[in-house]
């Protein structure tokens, strides 16, 4: 059977076993999350060997050229040698410039890049990985354009058992240095989108962040078709960024912001009901095939919403999804 050399240790790979599973089975320290190639937390560097094409296809060509691959997707059939990359090898140093609560559980985090020359290009709506001083990694969607704002904006929800968020909400301070890696994800405004295409955006919780970034990006690029923006929460207290979205609606008449809550609201502008049911009920079936959808947030919502609009007549390739699933990176 094939051997895996890692951090001065040698392990035997089981048949059809990934490098990640082998390392975890042998109690080695490596960050990981989804085990599906999406989060890219388990990035490793090959040494004097070649990783499989399948394990490399998930990452950018620039990283492939430097010998990186994903441990979760690499199933070696011969002896291999790998190592964890250092922070300096694959990340950009940033400073926390703002920590502001947007509601009781969501914080806006702004990051300044220490050396703008090192900053990578991204599109609003993609996500990047944050690496805190303890080496814990977590991925978050990007809510803005770095080129326009000269900072990176993230919206982060506090989770009771989240190692990273507990650090962020309790210990992080403005001026602290952390690192970022990215970008990843395909949920963004594509330049190939027809400028007059009808766009429907729907998200729950901090699913607002990528959608807000995508909407602004579309409008900045001269999108002239209607954009309907749904944001859902359990109650009024779970909604946020209402002033910003109303301002966007005032500036761009074709942008239509529709807040939704499960609990009844005292605000007549807020729609009451489950977000997926509200969106489905308001869609015009005769035009669904020409619409493009962006769905972000809780996986249960994203998958249900995708199924509903597809069965109603939307084209599968016009439904762009970012379910916030399996992004919690586990430090071992």
Each model region followed by its residue ranges:
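A short, basic/flexible loop-to-alpha-helix module at the beginning of a structural domain
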Residues: 183-194
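Short, conserved phosphate/pyrophosphate- and ester-handling motifs at nucleotide-, phospho-/glycolipid
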Residues: 125, 207, 298
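Short conserved beta-strand and strand-loop elements enriched in small hydrophobics
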Residues: 4, 82-85, 128-133, 176-182
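Ferredoxin-reductase
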Residues: 90-177, 197, 233-235, 261-263
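Short, structured interface segments
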Residues: 68-89, 177-180
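Histidine-anchored nucleotide/phosphate-binding helix
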Residues: 212-220
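Conserved S-adenosyl-L-methionine
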Residues: 220-226
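Reductase modules of NAD(P)H-dependent flavoproteins
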Residues: 1-71, 80, 226, 230-332
């Amino acid at each position: 059977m094939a051997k895996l050399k890692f951090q001065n240790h040698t392990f035997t790979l089981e048949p059809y076993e990934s490098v990640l599973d082998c390392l975890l089975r042998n109690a080695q320290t490596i960050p990981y999350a989804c085990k599906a190639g999406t989060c890219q937390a388990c990035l490793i560097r090959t040494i004097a060997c070649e990783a499989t094409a399948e394990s490399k296809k998930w990452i950018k060509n620039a990283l492939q050229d430097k010998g990186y691959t994903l441990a979760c997707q690499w199933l070696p059939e011969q002896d291999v040698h790998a190592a964890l990359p250092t922070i300096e090898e694959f990340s950009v140093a940033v400073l926390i410039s703002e920590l502001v609560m947007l509601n009781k559980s969501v914080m806006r985090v702004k990051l300044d890049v220490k050396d703008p020359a090192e900053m990578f290009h991204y599109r609003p709506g993609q996500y990047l990985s944050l690496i805190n001083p303890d080496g814990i990694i977590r991925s978050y969607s990007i809510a803005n354009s770095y080129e326009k704002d000269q900072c990176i904006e993230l919206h982060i929800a506090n989770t009771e058992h989240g190692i990273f968020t507990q650090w962020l909400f309790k210990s992080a301070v403005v001026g602290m240095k952390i690192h970022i890696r990215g970008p990843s994800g395909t949920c963004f405004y594509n330049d190939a989108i027809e400028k007059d295409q009808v766009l429907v955006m729907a998200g729950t919780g901090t699913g607002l962040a990528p959608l807000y970034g995508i909407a602004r990006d579309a409008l900045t690029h001269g999108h002239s078709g209607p954009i309907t923006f749904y944001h859902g929460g359990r109650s009024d207290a779970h909604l946020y960024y209402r002033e910003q979205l109303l301002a966007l609606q005032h500036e761009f008449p074709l942008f239509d912001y529709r807040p939704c809550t499960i609990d009844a609201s005292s605000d007549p502008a807020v729609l009451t009901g489950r977000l997926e049911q509200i969106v489905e009920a308001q869609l015009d079936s005769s035009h669904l095939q020409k619409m493009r959808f962006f769905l972000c947030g809780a996986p249960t919502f994203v998958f249900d919403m995708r199924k509903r609009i597809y069965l109603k007549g939307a084209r599968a390739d016009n439904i762009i999804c970012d379910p916030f699933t399996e992004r919690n990176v586990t430090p071992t």
